[in-house]
Amino acid sequence: MMNGQINDLLANIISMYAPQFGRTITKKVALNLAMTAIECQIENTSGDTYALMRTALSECGTILEENIEDGIISEVILSGAANMNPAFLLLKADGTSIHLAVNEKDGLIKQHTAERAIDAFKSAFANAKGS
């Protein structure tokens, strides 16, 4: 997926679902938020990437939307201090790769919400591969 596509999809997800987590964010504002984008290459000998990704996501957060045909899932993981700051994730399974984009908004006190959400996903993904 192109970076512009990721930004646009993530902005749509944030503007639609942020109010459920105590945030009011318009798409225009969401497009201007700082975003951490990470691409992971994952080798799977025990199953397909999408199924493992979905299993991991169901363990560590709340799945918001899912497009099975395109291998795309959007999710929110409560992270940061006391797990009260939402991190919005957009993931795409493509063969053995998972393309991961995370958006979070830290205030004056940095809670490293995006990093913690990524760590939570990676841990859940490792558990899914092991089961």
Regions found by a protein language model. Give the residues of each.
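Ser/Thr-rich, low-complexity intrinsically disordered terminal regions
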Residues: 1-131
